[in-house]
Amino acid sequence: MFRDFERHDLDGRHALFAGRLPGRLAFDAAGFEALWALHPEDFHVIHMPGGPVETPRWQQAFGRDYRYSGRVNSALPVPPLLDPLLAWAREAVHGRLNALLLNWYDGDLGHYIGPHHDSTRDMVPDAPIVTVSLGEERIFRLTQPKRKARRDFPARDGTVFVMPYATNLAWKHQVPRSARRRGRRISVTLRAFEE
């Protein structure tokens, strides 16, 4: 389905695809620092059943607004630093990718993201969700609580995950807390939203 990506079957009907960022797009130390410097000062606030909660990581949308958990993450223009990555993803995965959501994780601050399905509001139907992992290795976990199913995948520097639309609906995903991982990680998630 996605050339240059390895298929990982999850349940006979759904899969996750994993690959590597091409070497020409790898972020060196200076590039990583430039990307890290883009994180907002404040944490995004979302609505949870118990009330408003700050996300345990920094987050910013680029290109298109991202609506989820009762809030809007208002988009900024795509930084030139990310233009080559977006162009590659359009060519390698899906031509209508037009939005990026960055999450900045600081291990010293215990940053993580809990189990969730990505919001599909305003997304192009059946378009996959692409996540690029930069920096320190973390675990990318997929779960189906009703089936007590769990799959862990290492999210190393330069790892690219492609999650089909149907997989996102059927499986939750997360980057769990880690007492061992004290470094910094950036995830770049690309989606295709209707114009």
Locate each region found by the language model:
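Non-heme Fe(II) oxygenase metal-center motifs and adjacent flexible, charged/small-residue loops
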Residues: 1-195
